[in-house]
């Protein structure tokens, strides 16, 4: 089986890949997935009932969410495990009437599949070649459950997930499982949840705002044009009919697409779909996609059944739900490939062209006129933006909603420019994103919450778009000052919030801002670690991780994850001049054990260059932080993590005898570990490993 991005992020599914390696820029893949375009899925109760009866899934959304992630990877197909069955199914589908049927209409065309690259996104040289998507609930549901405090993520929920996830890791592994890559996968799962959400509608950025609304009809259940029209009208009128509809949302900026689902065994249903699609395009001006969601072979062909895994990116609430009630969902390989073909068309032929059209329109109508008028003269821009009358510029620009909150309206030039920058990030056009963020920053001086997020993503766009080596000068003069300014602005927001909320709990008041600040620092640290010159960039990552430990309100398990990441940072801090010598030195040390006395550590066989090499690493400091992490894991009763931490530092501390003395922390931890039966949890069989008990991991 080819090791993929999904395998790494869900490595507990794929422990047979635990000795693989991942590219250093893996963080860029995760961030691209975390800010991927969001698609809402709307279906009728009748449709959802049909789905539930056929595939044991609650709704169409719950079915399609399995297919979020990298579109080109098609990871749910799990081709290597089914072997020849995939080719048999694909050949059979080529002979059916579904292909010529769909050629008569602009719907997913299976023949397009060969024209698009399906290379593994994990190892692509240019990460921008991959397109990620995320699915979420209907927009009305998101608004009804929206948290009014604008919090990016919940610290407590993140801690609950991590605690249960680590217990699951302990139950499904033993001391013999290679753990180095698995521990990195665990950290990046934690990292992805701290920077991503599919249900948080932030007023300050648009990454989680839906871009496309997929409106589904069940032709097999007799749903017709009138049903489609009513669903579209309800969607378009959400801003009028929904209580507390956010003023920063606009359904007219979302692309509606009809998904017409039918039984592929019925020629009559297919013809109805064709006629309905033409009518919807002619009268409602909305595109349609046909999907053969039902077919006897999809249900009764047990030879090509695939068990689906949870998506890599999902909301924290959904992950916790599947943690408490893990489920197994299976689909036939033919249906899985049909859904991926539909998504290919949806993403590449409808969504991305729509986004590019909107970006071009905003550039021509908002961005270019501003550049032409001021031509980069920041002094004049600041002068024009100032309101000379009593400094009321902020109140004139912001709009108050029904709950008394003040935000930029969806039609304001500031918010549209922010959307232009965010959509450029989603399309991997980092140059346009950076220039737009930079242009917008001067307009947001009076709005610190908006300004902080804008500065943060200006820095992220620089790091994400860095295809060549980022120089020390660029980090020192451009990138790090942006991050420091963003953090200072977030801190200013916290002070303002504390001043407004003197009568309430100050922690409750500042937590929403702190969640953004935490996200900023954890993003910066991972992107610095993804740079090629780790000797230069690692100190910046260390600085932000230490600040997270000092200032952010993380739970104990979350804090220990950061302690371990600090250890990883020091492991990476190797002078580039002697990187090749470190590995050679270690091998030489192993080959010369006979030169060492039984109680004496002799260094006579090392050359001067070896000693120099040993001095230009931070291995001992890395081991020290790992030892701290082991102590803290022991306090949380996470004995598998304690065992792995002690294994990691064994080679570093084996020659330092005094550290093993009675009463010292190392010997205490070993004694505690010996008293615990870390392998007491039942071991799953190789075939059933993680599939039954880890199906919720995202």
Swiss-Prot record:
Gene this protein is translated from: TRS85
Role noted for this protein: Specific subunit of the TRAPP III complex that acts as an autophagy-specific guanine nucleotide exchange factor (GEF) for YPT1. TRS85 directs the TRAPP III complex to the phagophore assembly site (PAS) that is involved in autophagosome formation. Required for membrane expansion during autophagy and the CVT pathway. Required for sporulation. Has a role late in meiosis following DNA replication.
Composition bias, Basic and acidic residues: 678-689
A GO biological-process term: piecemeal microautophagy of the nucleus
Additional free-text comment from the UniProt record: Present with 8760 molecules/cell in log phase SD medium.
Record's keyword terms, sorted: Autophagy, Meiosis, Sporulation, Transport
Subunit structure comment from the entry: Part of the multisubunit TRAPP (transport protein particle) III complex composed of BET3, BET5, TRS20, TRS23, TRS31, TRS33 and TRS85.
Family of the protein in this entry: Belongs to the TRS85 family.
Lineage of the species this protein comes from: Eukaryota, Fungi, Dikarya, Ascomycota, Saccharomycotina
Name by which UniProt lists this protein: Trafficking protein particle complex III-specific subunit 85
Family matches, as Pfam families: TRAPPC-Trs85
Disulphides: none
GO CC field: cytoplasmic vesicle; cytosol; Golgi apparatus; phagophore assembly site; TRAPPIII protein complex
Cellular location(s): Preautophagosomal structure
This protein's record includes keyword Transport: yes
């Amino acid at each position: 089986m080819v090791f993929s991005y999904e395998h790494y992020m869900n490595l507990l599914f794929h422990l047979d890949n635990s000795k693989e390696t991942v590219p250093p820029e893996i963080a860029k893949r995760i961030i691209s997935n975390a800010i991927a375009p969001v698609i809402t899925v709307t279906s009728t109760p009748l449709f959802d009932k049909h789905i539930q009866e056929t595939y044991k899934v609650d709704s169409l959304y719950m079915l399609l969410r399995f297919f979020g992630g990298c579109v080109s990877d098609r990871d749910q197909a799990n081709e290597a495990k089914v072997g020849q069955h995939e080719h048999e199914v694909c050949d059979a589908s080529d002979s059916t009437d579904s292909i010529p049927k769909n050629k008569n209409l602009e719907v997913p065309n299976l023949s397009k599949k060969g024209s698009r690259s399906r290379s593994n996104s994990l190892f692509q040289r240019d990460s921008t070649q991959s397109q990620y998507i995320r699915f979420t609930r209907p927009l009305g549901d998101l608004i009804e459950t929206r948290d009014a405090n604008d919090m990016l993520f919940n610290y407590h929920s993140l801690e609950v997930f991590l605690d249960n996830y680590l217990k699951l890791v302990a139950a499904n592994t033993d001391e013999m499982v290679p753990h180095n890559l698995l521990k990195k996968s665990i950290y990046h799962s934690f990292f992805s949840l701290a920077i991503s959400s599919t249900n948080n509608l932030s007023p300050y950025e648009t990454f989680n705002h839906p871009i496309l609304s997929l409106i589904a009809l069940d032709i097999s259940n007799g749903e017709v044009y009138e049903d489609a029209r009513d669903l579209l009208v309800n969607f378009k009128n959400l801003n009028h009919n929904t209580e507390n509809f956010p003023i920063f949302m606009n359904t007219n900026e979302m692309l509606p697409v009809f998904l017409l689902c039918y039984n592929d065994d019925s020629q009559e249903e297919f013809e109805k779909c064709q006629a309905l699609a033409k009518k919807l395009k002619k009268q409602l001006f909305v595109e349609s996609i046909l999907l053969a969601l039902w077919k006897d072979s999809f249900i009764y062909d047990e030879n090509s059944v695939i068990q689906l895994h949870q998506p890599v990116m999902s909301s924290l609430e959904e992950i916790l739900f599947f943690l408490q009630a893990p489920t197994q969902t299976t689909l036939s390989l033919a249906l899985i490939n049909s859904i991926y073909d539909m998504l290919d068309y949806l993403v590449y032929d409808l969504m991305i062209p729509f986004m590019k059209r909107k970006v071009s329109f905003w550039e021509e109508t908002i961005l270019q006129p501003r550049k032409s008028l001021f031509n980069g003269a920041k002094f004049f821009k600041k002068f024009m933006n100032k309101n000379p009358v009593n400094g009321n510029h902020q109140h004139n620009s912001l709009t108050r909603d029904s709950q008394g909150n003040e935000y930029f309206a969806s039609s304001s030039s500031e918010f549209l420019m922010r959307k232009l920058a965010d959509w450029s990030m989603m399309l991997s056009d980092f140059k346009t994103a950076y220039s737009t963020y930079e242009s917008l920053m001067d307009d947001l001086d009076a709005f610190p919450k908006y300004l902080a997020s804008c500065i943060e993503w200006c820095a992220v766009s620089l790091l994400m778009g860095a295809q060549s080596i980022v120089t020390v000068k660029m980090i020192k003069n451009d990138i790090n000052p942006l991050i420091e300014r963003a953090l200072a602005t977030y801190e200013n927001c916290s002070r303002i919030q504390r001043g407004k909320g003197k009568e309430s709990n100050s922690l409750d008041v500042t937590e929403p801002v702190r969640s953004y600040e935490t996200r900023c620092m954890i993003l910066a640290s991972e992107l610095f670690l993804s740079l090629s010159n780790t000797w230069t960039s690692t100190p910046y990552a260390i600085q932000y991780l230490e600040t997270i430990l000092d200032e952010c309100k993380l739970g104990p398990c979350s804090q220990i994850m950061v302690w371990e990441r600090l250890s990883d940072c020091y492991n990476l801090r190797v002078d580039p001049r002697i990187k090749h010598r470190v590995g050679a030195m270690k091998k030489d040390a192993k080959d010369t054990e006979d030169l060492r006395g039984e109680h004496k550590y002799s260094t006579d066989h090392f050359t001067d260059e070896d000693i120099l090499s040993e001095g230009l690493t931070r291995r001992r400091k890395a081991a020290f932080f790992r030892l701290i992490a082991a102590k803290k894991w022991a306090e949380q009763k996470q004995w598998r993590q304690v065992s792995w931490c002690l294994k990691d530092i064994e080679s570093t501390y084996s020659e330092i005898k005094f550290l093993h003395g009675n009463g010292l922390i190392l010997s205490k931890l070993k004694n505690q570990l010996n008293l615990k039966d870390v392998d007491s949890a039942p071991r799953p069989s190789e075939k059933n490993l993680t599939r039954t008990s880890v199906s919720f991991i995202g």
